[in-house]
Amino acid sequence: MKKVIATIFFIPALVLIGTGKASMRGSFTLENLISLESKAVDVPVELVYAVILTESSGNHLAKSEADCRGLMQVSEEVWNIFMKGKRWNLAYNPEENVRCGIRYLGDLYKMYGSWEKVLRHYHGGDPNSKRAVTNRYVKKVLKRAGMMSGDRRWVNRKEL
């Protein structure tokens, strides 16, 4: 239980400190943005933090070999769909990056209706992928989301 509680508070703090966005109480924070954007498209906040932790470990300057960028490791193709008219170099901006990533997750959920399929697609582009690396990714994200929410339904899915 202590581990769950520590995780609930640690992950948002890690993201905020890692991005330099930790701020005084009452002012707008990345945490507020994640909460607002998540609610707008019905994406669980815990899932967003779990994706951020898994994709970039909270490093807003992270860049993959495939040129995916920022906290949520969005691709240029995804960026151009969800952030129309905004320059690709803004993908390193934490606020813009999470806006894009959350919108993408919400759009994928509308298509698939399953967080497992959403994460499979988010990771490798194929909602039905059975690749071992994709299976590990999905399990890791769902486990982290479950640890943050304390909700066991995120963990130990039979279809994984």
Specify the residue positions occupied by each region the protein language model found.
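Catalytic glycan-binding domains that act on GlcNAc-containing polysaccharides
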Residues: 23-160
